[in-house]
C-alpha cells in the first residue's frame, strides 16, 4: 500500500519494480538507506508484531517467547522498538517475572527440523 502511494520510494528499485517481489527485507533495506516510506512500513510492521506479542504474553504469560523467520535477521532494527513497545503495553510490566523474548536459534530451518522430529 505504501509503495503504491510512494512511486519514488527506493523499495521499488529493490524489488525490481514489481510489488509482488517486495518482502520485509525490502522495507528494512530501504529504511536503512533513508527511505521515509520504508521507515513507515517498518514502523507499522513492528507495531502489528508487538500487538501480537503483547497479546500472547498477556493471555498465556509464558516464560519465554521465541520469534522466528527471516525478519529476525534485522537484529536491533527489529528488536529494540519491538521490546520497547512490548514492555510498555504488557500487563505484567511491573512484575518481577518478565517474559523473555528471544530470537529462535534454528532460524529458517525450524520447520524442516520440526517435521523431521515429528516422524520420530
Please state what every model-predicted region is.
Residues 1-120:
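ATP-binding/phosphotransfer module of carbohydrate and carboxylate kinases, centering on a glycine-rich
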